[in-house]
A protein has these predicted regions:
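Active/ligand-binding-proximal structured segments within catalytic/core domains
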Residues: 1-34
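Charge-rich, well-structured scaffold segments of protease-associated domains
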Residues: 29-170
Length: 170
């Protein structure tokens, strides 16, 4: 809903880029590290928010929170990842929308129903706008919206609240 006009799909594209490296980690390192802990992780983009989540044993919580903090503050995917991930999102659109009549119907229905509201734009983005996305667009969106006062941290499990607060403040 917060995507700039003409940049539909930027939130979803950025979701993909969030796994492609920071100033201190290589592309895919986040996923490899989390998996090495025996943990699961994923992400999704909805109309109103993007969620990143991990299911991890409490003894690895500090490491996973540090990895998340790094990508939330220091995202820096290499150029080749920026281009290839845009192509991945374009292919995702082809598979999920363009090659699926019922998805096309719902996409057009939402566009007609919501008209001038941001919900008229598909989460994955309009194809012509996706093809124009680049790092400058993603970085601007990232710098504007990926800030602490715009995030919600949810941690559940066998742990002490004070410990989680201390980890979050690091």
């Amino acid at each position: 809903v917060d995507e700039p006009q003409g940049r539909s799909g930027i939130a979803h594209y950025l979701e993909h880029l969030m796994f492609k490296g920071t100033k201190t980690t290589d592309p895919g390192e986040f996923s490899r590290t989390v998996k090495s802990f025996g943990a699961e992780h994923n992400a999704f983009t909805s109309r109103d928010y993007t969620a990143y989540f991990e299911t991890v044993a409490v003894e690895h919580l500090e490491d996973v929170m540090a990895l998340n903090a790094d990508r939330m503050m220091n995202l820096a995917p290499p150029r080749e990842e920026i281009v290839s991930e845009r192509d991945v999102v374009i292919e995702e659109r082809r598979q999920r929308i363009d090659n699926n009549p019922s998805s096309q119907f719902y996409e057009h229905m939402n566009a007609a129903h919501y008209m001038t509201h941001p919900y008229a734009r598909p989460i994955v983005g309009w194809m012509d706008e996706l093809k124009e996305l680049d790092w400058a667009h993603a970085e601007n969106f990232y710098r504007k919206w990926y800030v602490p006062n715009n995030m919600i941290l949810i941690v559940t499990g066998d742990l002490e609240f004070e410990n989680v607060v201390n980890l979050a403040q690091k």
